[in-house]
Amino acid sequence: MLGFRSPIRLCKLSALGSTRLLPISRPKLFSTAVARYAADMETVNTTKRLARLRQLMQEHKIDVYIVPSEDSHQSEYIAPCDGRREFISGFSGSAGTAIVSMTKAALSTDGRYFNQASKQLDSNWELLKRGVENVPTWQEWTTEQAQGGKVVGVDPALITASGARSLEETLKRNGSSLVGISQNLVDLVWGKDRPAPPREKVRVHPDKFSGKTFQEKIADLRKELEKKKTAGFVISMLDEIAWLFNLRGSDIPYNPVFFAYAIITPTKAELYIDDDKITPEVVAHLGQDVVIKPYNSIFADAKALSEARRKEAGETASKFLLSNKASWALSLSLGGEEHVEETRSPIADAKAIKNEVELAGMRACHIRDGAALIEYFAWLENELVNKKTVLDEVDAADKLEQIRTKHDLFAGLSFDTISSTGPNGAVIHYKPEKGTCSIIDPDAIYLCDSGAQYLDGTTDVTRTFHFGKPTELEKKAFTLVLKGLIAIDTAVFPKGTSGFALDALARQYLWKEGLDYLHGTGHGVGSYLNVHEGPIGIGTRVQYTEVPIAPGNVISDEPGFYEDGKFGIRIENVIMAREVQTTHKFGDKPWLGFEHVTMAPIGRNLIEPSLLSDLELKWVNDYHAEVWDKTHHFFENDEFTRSWLQRETAPITK
């Protein structure tokens, strides 16, 4: 699943060597469904909502109001009750910032969502395309609106401390100011229609899957805190808390996390969570090692803890560690910048390097997940081509989920399945909805990006198929993307190399044709946790220069190509970084490479063998042989699927 953006313009497929696209035959039923495509991206009339928000802004004496996407834990994916930016703007993508002045409103988002946002925003909104030349950032737009000593407001729980400071400094130079408003104004506009916060029970994640007890993890964390000479660590990121305590929850769809905070000091471990989420099993699991406290007492406790520390040690008091993703509100509760050390979380670094138990779980769950995908694609082709069944995108996605549920340790999906036919595949984060989605056309490209949660790991895989006869242009585009995937998969590089440095390997073949894609090449993947996991990744984000790829990292490898209004192509495998043996060891340092764990055939009729080198063709055939070896036993009593798999994994020749 696509996690991160790349600020580069989309190019046209005509650059592949033709000035026009060959016509794609579509039955009338498909054409009708595509005509309804815009309905899937319905706009919401935000006039009344904006009017009410502006009334509240006047009452609070602010001129500009910022509405981030994130919740108070800076989560990428959020619970329905935290969908404030979507409520006020109508834009449902996972990333973006809304800004409202007394006369204007703007929505900033990245390249994954340009198409979607342009369809969902009504006439009240201006779309700020992030990374596009001559388009202001949301910070620049805000500063422009706040000229002349105006006041900008934001909920301090929804913006990072560093983000607030940066904006505050910019506004000061403009004679303006930033204020935190603890009562969220969008919540007041939303009123009684706002969904209730989730109240699901928390579950213990057994050590046989985590590979390490929570006591061992806390001990390791305390060693890191001792090295940094800090008074303690206040933790706000939900996946970090779930990982640290070997607990899982259901508060955010598809992400097995729960709303909580934690404070770890040299002598205490405190978990801040609503009491009604705690079961006797969790109490027994945590035992005497962890004190459970009310969720809403975190800010008061953090303030008291910091003040007590300063009173005891005076000016020499050591600072509290806080993630650089933590909220402005949490930083202020600890006394602000001078009493806090903001840094990349040591838990994020530790979590990103999977232990041997987690790596084994990743391998195992991807084989089971691959079997589900094989059964699904065999079924889908048979329904569309042989039975002539009319299926829409949601019908297909539901069938895939149904198949996955049959496999051991299945615990749900890891994100909304992107089941997309024809032009819908060009919408990078397309979300089909029953009643407005398209009928799947067997004579068009079908892109399916999906993933699942298993107790032993998390999967994320994209496959692009054509169940008819693809055009030469479609085959060429697909093969260029495949070459990029292979380049990352087979890369060998010295320890200390970042994902930023590797990114060009995936893009090089598209670049040679003057083409590109508007998203990152890879993101970290959690172990029965969030499908998007930092701090590592492969892409052009500056953050990726700061964290080198390390053995044990689990990352997606997912180059793509998108022709707006026509089709999308993406191929995605999950890969694991590991040390590799090389003939030489320049610099006397370890050399790294990748091991792929995704096991599903790559659409063979979209591959143009003449565009592959001999080594690339060998990689494809070796990969398909591995898929066959590891999955065919699932279909001993299913001759149809077994035959389909055998056909799709047979050697390809030039």
Swiss-Prot record:
PROSITE patterns linked: PROLINE_PEPTIDASE
Entries under Gene3D superfamilies matching the protein: Creatinase/methionine aminopeptidase superfamily (3.90.230.10), Creatinase/prolidase N-terminal domain (3.40.350.10)
Pfam families (alphabetical): Creatinase_N (PF01321), Creatinase_N_2 (PF16189), Peptidase_M24 (PF00557), Peptidase_M24_C (PF16188)
GO molecular function list: metal ion binding; metalloaminopeptidase activity
Binding site for Mn(2+) 1: 460, 558, 572
Cofactor or coenzyme needed: Mn(2+)
Binding site for Mn(2+) 2: 449, 460, 572
Keyword Protease: yes
Domain of life according to the entry: Eukaryota
UniProt record similarity statement: Belongs to the peptidase M24B family.
Name used for this protein in its record: Probable Xaa-Pro aminopeptidase P
